[in-house]
């Protein structure tokens, strides 16, 4: 099932972007036609990284730094890649604290002081998992598809904990949505 969902904060990512400037985008999730079409209006390089297909991302017992190694293997970006926009969607609802720390350790060298990010969290920890795939259809609208199967590892974090975990980002704005999710706008804090 596919639906369109309004976004209160997505347009803020693009308000200071010059359509003629080069843009580098990290999209966590599969490459969907709506997102590719949306970004075709910009001079940009899209990096699609479907970490959702790797879930659950957990440390291997008795293997030191196994999470760091897993993310280093999954996130092999070309040297000199710096993301202007990161689209995390609801990834952090499916990652434990250690996995988030390792993910950010690997991502941080690819951020710059002007990097911005967008994502979703939950307002109520008892909120059911969304199990959705997101694509950008317009500056203020997302195309949302229901996943065929439930994602493993759903364990959302409260917003206060997420602010601590996402140490290389500052929470600029968050908006409570009707389904008790939080839409978040983040900026790099390096």
Each PLM stretch: what is its role?
Residues 35, 99-100:
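Residues at alpha-helix caps and immediate loop-helix transition turns in enzyme cores, especially N-
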Residues 86-87:
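Hydrophobic beta-strand segment of the Class I
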Residues 1-17, 25, 32-76, 116-190:
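Class I (Rossmann-like) S-adenosyl-L-methionine-dependent methyltransferase catalytic domain
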Residues 91:
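Hydrophobic adenine-recognition pocket in adenosine-nucleotide-binding enzymes
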Residues 94:
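A short His-aromatic
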Residues 101-116:
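A short glycine-rich, Lys/Arg-flanked "PGG" loop and its adjoining helix->strand segment in the class I
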């Amino acid at each position: 099932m596919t639906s369109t969902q309004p976004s209160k904060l997505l347009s803020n990512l693009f308000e200071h972007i010059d359509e003629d400037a080069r843009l580098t985008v990290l999209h966590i999730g599969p490459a969907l036609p709506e997102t590719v079409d949306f970004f075709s209006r910009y001079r940009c390089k899209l990096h699609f990284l479907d970490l959702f297909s790797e879930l659950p991302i957990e440390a291997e017992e008795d293997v030191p730094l196994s999470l760091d190694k897993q993310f280093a293997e999954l996130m092999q970006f070309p040297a000199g890649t710096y993301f202007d926009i990161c689209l995390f969607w609801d990834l952090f609802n499916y990652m434990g604290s250690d996995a988030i720390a390792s993910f950010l350790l690997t991502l941080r060298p690819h951020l710059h002081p002007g990097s911005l990010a967008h994502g979703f969290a939950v307002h109520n920890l008892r909120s059911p998992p969304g199990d959705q795939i997101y694509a950008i259809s317009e500056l203020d609208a997302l195309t949302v598809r229901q996943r065929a199967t439930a994602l493993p590892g759903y364990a959302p974090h409260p917003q206060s904990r997420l602010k601590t975990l996402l140490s290389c980002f500052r929470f600029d704005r968050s908006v409570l949505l009707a389904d008790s999710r939080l839409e978040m706008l983040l900026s790099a804090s390096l």
